[in-house]
Amino acid sequence: MGKEVMVSDYGDDDGEDAGGGDEYRIPEWEIGLPNGDDLTPLSQYLVPSILALAFSMIPERSRTIHDVNRASQITLSSLRSSTNASSVMEEVVDRVESSVPGSDPKKQKKSDGGEAAAVEDSTAEEGDSGPEDASGKTSKRPRLVWTPQLHKRFVDVVAHLGIKNAVPKTIMQLMNVEGLTRENVASHLQKYRLYLKRIQGLTTEEDPYSSSDQLFSSTPVPPQSFQDGGGSNGKLGVPVPVPSMVPIPGYGNQMGMQGYYQQYSNHGNESNQYMMQQNKFGTMVTYPSVGGGDVNDK
């Protein structure tokens, strides 16, 4: 852009630099460079407005740091609201599924893999056999067997929560039984609610799960099960944490489970016989399908 010139001292007869050389090297970098007034300001558009209008070019408004901060706050607020809405929606779905008669929780999808999980109760009858695969081996799925001990634990948890506050997800967490799924609890809770209505005489409709009455009648119904808040006088208490379950090695296709019953806080109701007992869990049994098919594939 510029150039350097050597200025000699013409008064020196020897032709040597009077000042020793570099002192007389004059930089001319600024010669010919535009000044600040000659430069195009950054706020000015490079394309003239008339030309932009001819090509339908609409100039965008320049963004400031305040615009960036405002957009960031709006994005964070929308993310927080969507997270809260999803958690509230999950709780509402749990209550609707457990309270509406005729709803089929078996058609719900598992949250981890998104695959449909068909779960059959112990009172379901053996179905027709399905086709075998190419290797001649039939697929096997675990089926939950609701034993009287496991049903007793279910009844105690429902009595603690109250029949109106009991939802499948909370019951599953308080029961703390290894291998028990939300679909198992939702199906059993629906049948148990119909059973309670029948023994109270609140409904005359036919029970499609009449085969479960023998299991339900094996355990007395606690009086607090009919209350809104169960044994907590309308308020959900904080239960004592349950010890982790220890699976027992089984034989063949059987899996054993054993643990200790949780002692719930009863808020003054110390004589409640359903809250202070120790209990054993039922067993999770993997039944082979009869005739080469899976009973869940009906």
UniProtKB/Swiss-Prot annotation:
Coiled coil: none annotated. Residues 138-197 bind DNA. It comes from the Eukaryota. Residues 104-113 have a biased composition (Basic and acidic residues). Its main location: nucleus. InterPro entries: Homeodomain-like_sf, LUX/BOA-like, Myb_dom, Myb_dom_plants, SANT/Myb. It holds the Pfam family Myb_DNA-binding. Residues 209-227 have a biased composition (Polar residues). This is Transcription factor BOA. It comes from Arabidopsis thaliana. The lineage of its organism: Eukaryota, Viridiplantae, Streptophyta, Embryophyta, Tracheophyta.
